């Protein structure tokens, strides 16, 4: 019969503590890039949907990560990370 391997790794900080630290970092980054009213509305939506639960914390983390990723990917003006936007010709000549 197989046995589970013994836990030989170093102790990690509790998952809940790490999750709350991640949420705090994401919130701090989000307020630099998005209007507070949008973020407040997102928080209200999450609270109304999930209440005060860990599922709500996980949902808002996932949404903030996606928003920030897309924001940086399309070219944030606050950062050098992202795709440089090229000007498109008005006559549509660049289309194939």
From Swiss-Prot:
| Effect listed in the UniProt record for changing residue 21 to Q | Partial loss of Na(+) permeability for ion channel function
Phenotype for residue 73 to A/S: Complete loss of LTR transactivation and of G2/M cell cycle arrest. Transdominant mutation
Q: Which GO terms describe its cellular component?
A: host cell; host cell nucleus; host extracellular space; virion component
Q: Mutating residue 90 to K leads to what result?
A: Partial loss of cell killing and G2/M cell cycle arrest
In the record, the effect of residue 88 to K is given as: Partial loss of G2/M cell cycle arrest
Q: Give the consequence of mutating residue 76 to S.
A: Complete loss of G2/M cell cycle arrest
Q: Which residues carry this modification: Phosphoserine?
A: 79, 94, 96
Task: Tell me the impact of changing residue 75 to A.
Answer: Complete loss of G2/M cell cycle arrest
Q: What is the effect of changing residue 58 to Q?
A: No effect on ion channel activity
Q: Name one GO biological process term.
A: monoatomic ion transmembrane transport
User: Record's superkingdom?
Assistant: Viruses
Does the record's keyword annotation contain NAD? Answer: no
Where mainly found? virion
Mutating residue 18 to R leads to what result? Partial loss of cell killing
Query: Where are the annotated segments for Homooligomerization?
Result: 1-42
Swapping residue 94 to G leads to an effect described as:
Partial loss of cell cycle arrest
Effect on the protein of changing residue 32 to A: No effect on incorporation in virion
Tell me the outcome of changing residue 34 to I: Partial loss of cell killing and nuclear localization
What the entry lists under InterPro entries is as follows:
RetroV_VpR/X
Effect of changing residue 54 to R: reported as:
Partial loss of cell killing
Consequence the record notes for mutating residue 30 to L: Complete loss of G2/M cell cycle arrest
Q: Which family does it belong to?
A: Belongs to the HIV-1 VPR protein family.
What other comment is given for this protein? The infectious clone pNL4-3 is a chimeric provirus that consists of DNA from HIV isolates NY5 (5' half) and BRU (3' half).
What binding partners and quaternary form does the record give?
Homooligomer, may form homodimer. Interacts with p6-gag region of the Pr55 Gag precursor protein through a (Leu-X-X)4 motif near the C-terminus of the P6gag protein. Interacts with host UNG. May interact with host RAD23A/HHR23A. Interacts with host VPRBP/DCAF1, leading to hijack the CUL4A-RBX1-DDB1-DCAF1/VPRBP complex, mediating ubiquitination of host proteins such as TERT and ZGPAT and arrest of the cell cycle in G2 phase.
Task: Please state what the protein is called.
Answer: Protein Vpr
* Encoding gene per record: vpr
């Amino acid at each position: 019969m197989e046995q589970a391997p013994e836990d030989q790794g170093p102790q990690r900080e509790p998952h809940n503590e790490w999750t709350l630290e991640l949420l705090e970092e994401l919130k701090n980054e989000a307020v630099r890039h998005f209007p507070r009213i949008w973020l407040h509305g997102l928080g209200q939506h999450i609270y109304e949907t999930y209440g005060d639960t860990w599922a709500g914390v996980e949902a808002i983390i996932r949404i903030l990560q996606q928003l920030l990723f897309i924001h940086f990917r399309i070219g944030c003006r606050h950062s050098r990370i992202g795709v440089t936007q090229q000007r498109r010709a008005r006559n549509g000549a660049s289309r194939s």
